[in-house]
Amino acid sequence: MGMYKYIREAWKSPKKSYVGQLLKQRMIKWRREPAVVRIERPTRLDRARALGYQAKQGYVIVRVRVRRGGRKRPRWKGGRKPSKMGQVKYSPKKSLQWIAEEKAARKFPNLEVLNSYWVGEDGMYKWFEVIMVDPHHPVIKSDPKIAWIALKHHKGRVFRGLTSAGKKGRGLRNKGKGAEKIRPSIRANEGKGK
């Protein structure tokens, strides 16, 4: 087995391998950090490489913390029955991974989100690492594998659901029978696709 295969096997079931103990120690530190942090290198090198990361200029790795569970909506100021306030029991129509990608994109507006992957969770939070690319960097522009991200129609791709997590949330992994209301978009089909 090559190095990447060993890493992948260890991360398949983190609690049973050495990764579990490492994660415990790391999360103690991660909880004290801000929600969005730029890091030097990926925690899961095998996953990052599989999703398009390269150790060269123009690539940035960002670790994002997202609160788990449903979305608590803001409290109303006007008077109403507490049961009709509509604060709890509403879940967002986006995955936490997609939300994490958007958080990273807002923190670094000059970069584009390429992809992301899970790195850990506890009872309150989930952590994802987001691979970001600088579309204006000459190294990126001259690399034919990633130069497409510099084109203007890929600007703000994460906010339009064009990343892998976004496409999954929009139901675009399905096609054929049962997926008639998914394309061109859920909104075009008056929300019947979800």
Swiss-Prot record:
One of its GO terms (cellular component) is cytosolic large ribosomal subunit. This is Large ribosomal subunit protein eL15. Residues 177-194 have a biased composition (Basic and acidic residues). It comes from Pyrococcus abyssi (strain GE5 / Orsay). InterPro entries: Rbsml_eL15_core_dom_sf, Ribosomal_eL15, Ribosomal_eL15_arc, Ribosomal_eL15_CS, Ribosomal_uL23/eL15/eS24_sf. Transmembrane segments: none annotated. Coiled coil: none annotated. The keyword Ribosomal protein applies. The keyword Ribosomal protein applies. Keywords: Ribonucleoprotein, Ribosomal protein. HAMAP family: Ribosomal_eL15. Residues 167-176 have a biased composition (Basic residues). GO terms for molecular function: RNA binding; structural constituent of ribosome. GO terms for biological process: cytoplasmic translation.
